[in-house]
Amino acid sequence: MAHATLSAAPSNPRLLRVALLLLLLVAASRRAAGASVVTELRCQCLQTLQGIHLKNIQSVNVRSPGPHCAQTEVIATLKNGKKACLNPASPMVQKIIEKILNKGSTN
């Protein structure tokens, strides 16, 4: 009489490798989905513009210095949906911010 023995080792090592690879891919994709949090922990503006025409700007976000970045960042959202970093020390950018703040306070 033959007895069937169950073994803990898989009979197909290639199947095991494929399963482990799939598991690693799933884990990596989940980590990548949370990667946007990491980008918030550093300066967003590596290069800045000295100015941009006010008619092209939809909104402006001024980020104060903090643990994420030691400098003030001015990020303009343009009407075409793109974002542009502006130099907060530029006189033109300071005028843009002033006009947008005055426009918002009169409404």
Swiss-Prot record:
Provide any one GO MF term from the record. chemokine activity
What SUPFAM superfamilies does the annotation carry?
Interleukin 8-like chemokines (SSF54117)
- Example GO BP: neutrophil chemotaxis
Q: Which residues form a coiled coil?
A: none
| Disulfide cross-links | C43-C69, C45-C85
Q: Which UniProt keywords apply?
A: Chemotaxis, Cytokine, Disulfide bond, Inflammatory response, Secreted, Signal
Instruction: Name the major location.
Output: secreted
Q: How far does the signal peptide extend, from start to end residue? A: 1-34
Do you know which SMART domains this protein is assigned to? SCY
Q: Pfam families of this UniProt entry?
A: IL8
- Subcellular location(s) per record: Secreted
GO CC aspect terms: extracellular region; extracellular space
Q: How is it modified after translation?
A: N-terminal processed form GRO-gamma(5-73) is produced by proteolytic cleavage after secretion from peripheral blood monocytes.
UniProt record similarity statement: Belongs to the intercrine alpha (chemokine CxC) family.
Which purpose does this protein serve, as stated in its record? Ligand for CXCR2. Has chemotactic activity for neutrophils. May play a role in inflammation and exert its effects on endothelial cells in an autocrine fashion. In vitro, the processed form GRO-gamma(5-73) shows a fivefold higher chemotactic activity for neutrophilic granulocytes.
Q: What's this protein's name?
A: C-X-C motif chemokine 3
Query: What taxonomic ancestry is recorded?
Result: Eukaryota, Metazoa, Chordata, Craniata, Vertebrata
Gene name of this polypeptide: CXCL3
